[in-house]
Amino acid sequence: MLCLVVCCLIWLISALDGSCSEPPPVNNSVFVGKETEEQILGIYLCIKGYHLVGKKSLVFDPSKEWNSTLPECLLGHCPDPVLENGKINSSGPVNISGKIMFECNDGYILKGSNWSQCLEDHTWAPPLPICRSRDCEPPETPVHGYFEGETFTSGSVVTYYCEDGYHLVGTQKVQCSDGEWSPSYPTCESIQEPPKSAEQSALEKAILAFQESKDLCNATENFVRQLREGGITMEELKCSLEMKKTKLKSDILLNYHS
């Protein structure tokens, strides 16, 4: 593997201007070169048991020089910790068993442990924390619902409502606290009519039957009154209906045989 890396590096350097200087040596490392747009990108990889401190890549530019400060491969150091939007009480490489402390900038809250230790396998434990903004992301909008509120800074409150035909399940108001909304978001569920009891259904049927009977009585009474006002007796009405019935039958027979 080392031979392959060296051969690759020799080929890349010879492919460019012959005046290119050799990459500066870094103890306990392997150098890998890669040609990119008439330049050589060099990367230092530390051998097992060592850890890189500094910038791992160099670029050979037209000035014929390697344009970066050399890194180091040091024994027993953990990777340089990174804490965006925060501070670490360490200004250099941390040895095995060394501890560091973390603190977030104003407006941010620490998520994770406020300390970590460098282990023998060059890892950090507990894992490195992050600094999360105390402000919140826009809250979720429930299906068939919406919220009112335009600011999502820490301490802000939004209020939830549902569309017509739906009711809110959960807390109507949620508050932004240290980058998170609490309590949990509510949901909007369809309003279901409660099932009617057997007694209520029987009562409604009885009322409907009574109304129909009442309407029938009123219609009969009106019909009889109209007969009397027209001077027509029930016998005359019956005779007239029989004649119309006979005529209707004869018309049907004539149409059938024609």
Swiss-Prot record:
InterPro entries for this protein: SEZ6_CSMD_C4BPB_Regulators, Sushi/SCR/CCP_sf, Sushi_SCR_CCP_dom
Subcellular location: Secreted
Positions of disulphide bridges: C46-C73, C78-C118, C104-C131, C136-C176, C162-C188
GO cellular component: extracellular space
Gene Ontology terms: biological process: complement activation, classical pathway; innate immune response; negative regulation of complement activation, classical pathway; positive regulation of protein catabolic process; regulation of opsonization; response to symbiotic bacterium
PROSITE patterns with a match to the protein in the record: SUSHI (PS50923)
Record SMART domains: CCP
Domain of life: Eukaryota
Protein name (Swiss-Prot/TrEMBL): C4b-binding protein beta chain
Organism: Rattus norvegicus
Organism placement in taxonomy: Eukaryota, Metazoa, Chordata, Craniata, Vertebrata
Gene: C4bpb
